[in-house]
Amino acid sequence: MRPLGSLVPEPARAAIEQAAALIAQVGRPNVRMQFDFYHAQIEGGDLSTRFARHHAVIGHVQVAAVPSRAEPDEGEVSYPAIFDMLDRNDYAGFVGCEYRPRRRTEDGLGWARSYGIGVG
């Protein structure tokens, strides 16, 4: 389930807290939340607290710079701190990147190299 908040006009949108409540109500281990750090920051911030509160139902996270939605190496969110927080919470789900590259995708992967992620 992907909660996008009120900024995205979509019938299935929901706030993180609403999505977590719905997942708890469904009660199925294969229904998980996608926690998009970009949308969570836009919709109120407090990222570490909100992630920790709903960690048990999060199976996928997404990263992007706020507010530019470019590579996650600029802006309001400190992704080194976010990735440290994911490690401290023993997060074992997926990490996705949904952003608009400033140039070619390959040129913008410098941020990922510091985490041991490379191209080719």
Language model: regions and residue ranges:
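Short beta-strand segments at enzyme active-site cores
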Residues: 1-3, 96
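Surface-exposed cleft-lining segments at the edges of enzyme active sites
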Residues: 4-11
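Histidine-acidic metal/acid-base catalytic patches
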Residues: 13-120
